[in-house]
């Protein structure tokens, strides 16, 4: 079977074609980072406008590069939730238009579910497993019992980890998106400043990054000659330590020794290095997708959509996007 997938939940316009036997047949992503960079973050109205401007040219490019026409597609997968509502509207409307015009079934996908199954595009993971989802909008831990069966273990109480990266980068005058910039700059850091690690009582699987962000702001005000490289290094080491400790506690609590780490922040080189070393030291299976699959893309939506379609899930043409349906609830609704 083949699906065409649509992803417009934030600031990437992405389309892909995936075949459950042949694999990836087409994949196109257009980032809006340059558009949002002057503002230090994503501006929802601008994001929606760029999606509207770009989705048809990207669609044409996808069909040309894949040499596939819509008659060869079995169904349309699309991101229904969560995301910026104005951005979601563009992708959902486009998916619905294709489904109506070409009489194709419409299959809804949860954005976080897509991230979880991005690793399956490279290697299947045995159930059950733990999923750490880390991005600009999410920092969550889930127990994945099977496809569509998700137990929420903990999440951020304030900023998402990717959001914290962007805000610290803005404090340092580094530009947007902050994650890749801090990752590169941290490699040149030498001095490790002690920074707070909130909610670190053993067994607490929730996250908090606002205090860490405030501590860096205070440090910058207090020490005038502080090196940006050292701040980036200190911030990143602290963040990676928090994420690893929480993951280890989740393993201890559940007894599960398989960990999937996904989302845009999973592309971070230091995080990959530390988690890989920890997997060898503590004896757990670690799965992190290739960096090209870590950030938002339509291939992950295609894979998850394929799994949903095989289970008989189809949405009506009057389905509307939702800004934030919890993953565990989505798994129960769309089964």
Swiss-Prot record:
Positions annotated to bind substrate: 133-137, 166, 179, 183, 268
Any GO CC annotation of this UniProt entry: cytoplasm
GO molecular function: iron ion binding; N(6)-L-threonylcarbamoyladenine synthase activity
Catalytic activity: L-threonylcarbamoyladenylate + adenosine(37) in tRNA = N(6)-L-threonylcarbamoyladenosine(37) in tRNA + AMP + H(+)
Cofactors, names only: Fe(2+)
Enzyme class: transferase
EC number: 2.3.1.234
Keyword Transmembrane helix included in the entry's annotation: no
UniProt KW keywords: Acyltransferase, Cytoplasm, Iron, Metal-binding, Transferase, tRNA processing
S-S pairs: none
InterPro entries on file: ATPase_NBD (IPR043129), Gcp-like_dom (IPR000905), KAE1/TsaD (IPR017861), Peptidase_M22_CS (IPR017860), TsaD (IPR022450)
Record keyword Acyltransferase present: yes
Superkingdom of source: Bacteria
Alphabetized SUPFAM superfamilies for the sequence: Actin-like ATPase domain (SSF53067)
Entry's localization field: Cytoplasm
GO annotation, biological process: tRNA threonylcarbamoyladenosine modification
A Pfam family it matches: TsaD
Binding note for cofactor: Binds 1 Fe(2+) ion per subunit.
Record: residues binding Fe cation: 111, 115, 296
Family, per entry: Belongs to the KAE1 / TsaD family.
Function: Required for the formation of a threonylcarbamoyl group on adenosine at position 37 (t(6)A37) in tRNAs that read codons beginning with adenine. Is involved in the transfer of the threonylcarbamoyl moiety of threonylcarbamoyl-AMP (TC-AMP) to the N6 group of A37, together with TsaE and TsaB. TsaD likely plays a direct catalytic role in this reaction.
Protein name in the entry: tRNA N6-adenosine threonylcarbamoyltransferase
Organism, as annotated: Aquifex aeolicus (strain VF5)
């Amino acid at each position: 079977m083949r699906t065409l997938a649509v992803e417009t939940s934030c600031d990437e316009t992405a389309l892909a074609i995936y075949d459950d036997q042949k694999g990836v047949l087409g994949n196109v992503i257009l980032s809006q980072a340059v558009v949002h960079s002057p503002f230090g973050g994503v501006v929802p109205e601008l994001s929606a406008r760029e999606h509207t401007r770009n989705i048809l040219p990207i669609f044409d490019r996808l069909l040309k590069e894949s040499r596939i026409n819509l008659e060869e597609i079995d169904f349309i997968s699309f991101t229904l939730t969560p995301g910026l509502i104005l951005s979601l509207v563009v992708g959902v409307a486009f998916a619905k238009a294709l489904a109506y015009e070409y009489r194709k079934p419409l299959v809804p996908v949860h954005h976080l579910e897509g991230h979880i199954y991005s690793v399956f595009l490279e290697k299947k993971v045995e159930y059950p497993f733990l999923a750490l989802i880390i991005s600009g909008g999410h920092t969550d831990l889930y127990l994945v019992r099977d496809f569509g069966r998700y137990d929420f273990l903990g999440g951020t109480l304030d900023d998402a980890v990717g959001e914290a990266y962007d805000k610290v980068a803005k404090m340092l005058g580094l530009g947007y998106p902050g994650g890749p910039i801090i990752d590169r700059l941290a490699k040149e850091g030498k001095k490790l400043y002690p920074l707070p690690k909130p909610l670190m009582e053993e067994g607490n699987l929730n996250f908090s990054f606002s205090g860490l962000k405030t501590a860096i702001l205070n440090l910058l005000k207090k020490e005038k000659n502080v090196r940006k490289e050292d701040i980036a290094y200190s911030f990143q080491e602290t963040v990676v330590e928090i994420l690893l400790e929480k993951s280890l506690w989740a393993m201890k609590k559940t007894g599960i020794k398989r960990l999937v780490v996904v989302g845009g922040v999973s592309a971070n080189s230091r995080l990959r290095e530390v988690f890989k070393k920890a997997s060898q030291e503590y004896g757990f299976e670690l799965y992190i997708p290739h960096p090209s699959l870590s950030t938002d893309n339509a291939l992950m939506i295609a894979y998850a959509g394929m799994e949903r379609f095989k289970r008989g899930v189809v949405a009506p043409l009057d389905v509307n996007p939702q800004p934030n349906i919890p993953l565990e609830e989505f798994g129960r609704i769309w089964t």
